[in-house]
């Protein structure tokens, strides 16, 4: 399908993928090129709309040939039509798609069953990441490299996160790993947000969280533990889904972003990590989407990086369990493996279905109703004819007994 067929009423094919509860619609622009970014944005807004579009997905992923060949450009658009930088689970899903439908595209080194993707397109400095097939059937891996310094456009270092305590760089090896420690003020949720515990029981609510900032293609704030409020951890990591637990996570992610908008002008992903079980569990509230997702690939990478750098888990591969996804499918996990050239994320993308839709612009134009035809002038009825005066009936005659 060519660009001309798109602009003259052509259909757009998409592939739906899911990984750990993250869902994506992949549009292959090597076969269906779109004319411009305005079209990509409006198409994403429409197709991701759960009421007037297709819905049922977190993002649209656009894949196209990178300049010079030998690589694929990876672009990710949000539900509001904006473009974001990167996505770990999205890259794994895109790699799975490339393995099935674009086997001719290899990374420049020619390594079998591996591909190079250009990410972080909106930054103006595209970054190469490698995606490949694992030894286990259906397993994909992506090497996003080591965490990097926060871009100035995403994090203003001169702002005061807490109102009292400015962010401070971690000392020692952590600083060399671009791990920034910061304290930030938090708002107390309404009393009815929590379950039977927490502030509703009189437990003190922390006025500050101590977290770590990690940039691995996306900006992340990682918060480990209960921050002095055991009920907070119990509520966030409840064993079964509850509306209060969902609402609490939504409140914390949204309020942290709102209160610290000056520090994070384009938003920050908010991750909570629990270490009370055998395997680390995490939950991620995502910027741009402005809500929690069932899982987050770059979130798993950021959380594992903090745990490894702070020696909170043994060296070696770290299994991260997205807690929200485990409510629906127990055992769901992602694995993060440290290596000499960065962190490697692996998981099992699942191809859900194939669909074909028109672009939003290709929908038939609205058919306006014909102009109203005014009714003919009212024909006045003839004057009312008054009825003759009532004739009183004769008096009732009693029936003899």
Question: What are the roles of these predicted feature ranges?
Answer:
Residues 2-137, 147, 204-205, 214, ...:
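A glycine-rich beta-to-alpha transition motif near the start of alpha/beta enzyme domains, typified by
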Residues 44, 142, 153, 182-184, ...:
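Generic low-polarity alpha-helical segments
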Residues 143, 151-180, 196, 235-261:
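Aspartyl protease catalytic domain
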Residues 363-399:
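Long, intrinsically disordered low-complexity tandem-repeat segments
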Residues 170-238:
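Internal active-site segments that recognize and position negatively charged phosphoryl groups
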Residues 166, 200-201, 228, 375, ...:
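Polar low-complexity intrinsically disordered regions enriched in Ser/Thr and small residues
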Residues 142, 149-167, 171-177, 184, ...:
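C-terminal domain-closing interface element
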